[in-house]
Design a protein with these regions (language model features):
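Short amphipathic beta-strand starts and helix->beta connectors
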Residues: 139-146
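A generic structural signal for short, non-catalytic loop/turn and secondary-structure boundary residues
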Residues: 95-100, 141, 151, 197-201
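Extended, low-hydrophobicity segments enriched in charged/polar residues
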Residues: 1-112
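Tryptophan-centered motif/residue detector
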Residues: 124, 140, 204-208
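Short edge beta-strands and adjacent turn/loop segments
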Residues: 107, 146-150
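Surface-exposed, low-hydrophobicity interaction/linker segments
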Residues: 91-139
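Exposed alpha-helical structural elements
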Residues: 33, 111-114, 132, 168-171, ...
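Alpha-helical oligomerization segments
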Residues: 148, 154-209
Length: 209
């Protein structure tokens, strides 16, 4: 897992989830408490990732209805205008053209979705909590071979061995929009244009506001 080494907000998020008593002074986290949290997450049954995504997508549809948006025409749109994405983005500094300081972390897990028990960065705004992150990551790994590979405090990127099929691209794009409604991977912001990215790409990018 690639992690931004100087991202204090990421450290704050990790401590907030694993040792909430020390979230105000996250450099003083209690190792025993963090270890117990990790064990708890790893020992719990993993939720049904497909069901989690269906619930989140249902929330997005309700939000669209509340905003008087037509789901098919204004949210889904046409599958067009996408560009391939085969490069991680979150650790690049646009001002310098170089990467931020990085940690290449070897996480001692048997399964890739268990990474979030060690790095519980979510559970704020629309970013899912650890059980949901683990469930969705398990489902996407089993379906597509997707592995969590790069992280900052508000970004997450998965790497795939090969792009998904064009036939499944819209289905997966809807799942990703449910998972991350702040997706900003394309010019018009429609799920269709995201789908046109996915069938050409081996990197999935997520960003939460």
């Amino acid at each position: 897992m690639l992690i931004q080494a100087d991202d204090e907000t990421l450290l704050e998020c990790l401590v907030m989830n694993a040792d909430p008593e020390h979230d105000a002074d996250f450099y003083e986290f209690d190792l025993k408490t963090v270890t117990e949290y990790r064990k708890k997450m790893l020992s719990a049954p993993v939720k049904d990732g497909k069901a989690v995504l269906e619930e989140l997508t249902g929330q997005r549809k309700e939000e669209a209805e509340d905003d008087d948006l037509d789901w098919e025409e204004e949210v889904l749109g046409e599958m067009e205008g996408g560009e391939p994405n085969d490069r991680f983005a979150n650790y690049w500094n646009d001002d310098t053209g170089m990467t931020y300081p990085l940690i290449l972390a070897k996480i001692p897990v048997k399964n890739p979705w268990e990474i979030f028990a060690y790095l519980p960065f979510g559970n704020w705004n629309e970013c899912p909590d650890t059980p949901d992150l683990m469930a969705v990551a398990k489902y996407w790994f089993e379906q597509h071979g997707a592995i969590p590979a790069a992280m900052s405090h508000d970004e997450l990127e998965f790497e795939l061995p090969t792009p998904i099929s064009k036939e499944r691209a819209m289905e997966v794009a809807v799942e990703q929009y449910g998972f991350c409604p702040d997706l900003d991977q394309n010019e018009d912001g429609s799920i269709g244009s995201l789908a046109d990215v996915l069938w050409q790409s081996t990197v999935w990018y997520f960003w939460w506001d």
